Amino acid sequence: MPGRAVVSLRIALIAAVAAAGAACVDPDPPARPTALETAWVEIADQLFELELALDGATRFRGLSDRPRIPGNGGMLFVYPRPRPLALVMRRCPVPIDAAFVDEEGRVVAIRVMEVEPPRAPGESVAAYEARLPIYASGVPAQFVVETAGGRLGELGLAVGDQLVFDTEALRQRAR
């Protein structure tokens, strides 16, 4: 049985993910998906058109309930300031790659996020949340780029690589 410190840390991480917003995290399906503004991001000499997640509600919803992610598509999460970030895979029927990016556009961490079993009938939201793996940046980041699972590996993206996009303009728009 985990010690009290481990349980407390897990609870703190779950709270941090809920407060920060994360990938594929809407516990209830949206009534109707809305079209989001997009931005172009250059990743390993390839252009990606990424949906923008500029506010807490959009970051919280993330890529949930998407049956597929286009090969050069995905989402760009923008936060008002750099901080340690964490993601979970809720209601995501497809695997996702996540690149945590600093305020300069440099990759500081990469996570491969696998599909998690959906919330079971009779399973409480709290129990569902508690069983989801947490994918943490480990260091401060201001942006997260999410793409189809395996895509960042195909491109050979690595920690330290530079992404090309207008970090300053997006940073000013984050709420």
Predicted regions and their residues:
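Bacterial N-terminal signal peptides that target proteins for export
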Residues: M1-L13
